[in-house]
């Protein structure tokens, strides 16, 4: 790993049926980011991910979309970390969060999975909770205590509405702008900016 490399891993599920789902926000953000720099993703089997890279200022940004399905995200993240011999402070996980309102962002440098199966698997495979994660709120499903789990699954796997997408596009832009400034702004300042953002 070089000092000027930044590793961004967006979580989601591969497959056409999941492309526009709320659970695929990590993928959708990275696709938006890569298009800005005309970068194309290619499948890297050894990394269990689709991958692209581009340069911003003096930094090389490496973007990954795991091809393992959400619940096995840790397999891809561990493969990436081991292959590049990465210090985890250079890794940023992009993930959806059902406990955050739509349009809210939360940057955490460590912590539990919060019930998110993708984060849970990463913690299990890396054997640590100490890694950066940028959580993007997708809001909660309607309350129905008798079908709570079913409601949650259908909500995260459900497609993003056009109204939600309008909000999320602003969120993606804010996160991308913050990631672009990693080499010129203090990380604590970036964390504060993201955590105070709400569209």
UniProtKB/Swiss-Prot annotation:
One of its GO terms (molecular function) is peptidyl-tRNA hydrolase activity. One of its GO terms (biological process) is rescue of stalled ribosome. This is Peptidyl-tRNA hydrolase. InterPro entries: Pept_tRNA_hydro, Pept_tRNA_hydro_CS, Pept_tRNA_hydro_sf. Its EC number is 3.1.1.29. It is found in: Cytoplasm. The record marks 96 as: Stabilizes the basic form of H active site to accept a proton. Monomer. It is an enzyme of class 3 (hydrolase). TRNA binds at residues 18, 69, 71, 117. Keywords: Cytoplasm, Hydrolase, RNA-binding, tRNA-binding. Belongs to the PTH family.
């Amino acid at each position: 790993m070089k000092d000027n490399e930044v590793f961004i891993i967006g979580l989601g599920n591969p497959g056409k049926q999941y492309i526009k789902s709320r659970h695929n926000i990590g993928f959708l953000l990275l696709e938006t980011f890569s298009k800005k720099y005309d970068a194309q993703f290619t499948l890297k089997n050894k990394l269990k991910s689709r991958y692209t890279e581009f340069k911003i200022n003096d930094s090389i940004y490496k973007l990954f979309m795991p091809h393992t399905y959400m619940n096995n995200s840790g397999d891809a993240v561990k493969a990436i970390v081991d292959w590049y011999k990465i210090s985890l402070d250079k890794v940023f996980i992009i993930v959806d969060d059902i406990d955050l309102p739509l349009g809210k962002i939360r940057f955490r440098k460590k912590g539990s999975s919060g019930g998110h199966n993708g984060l849970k698997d990463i913690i299990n495979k890396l054997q640590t909770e100490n890694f950066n994660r940028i959580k993007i709120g997708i809001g909660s499903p309607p309350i129905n205590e008798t079908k709570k789990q079913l409601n949650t699954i259908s909500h995260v796997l459900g497609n993003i509405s056009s109204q939600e997408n309008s909000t999320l596009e602003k969120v993606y832009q804010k996160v991308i702008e913050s990631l672009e400034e990693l080499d010129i702004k203090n990380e604590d300042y970036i964390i504060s900016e993201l955590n105070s953002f709400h569209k």
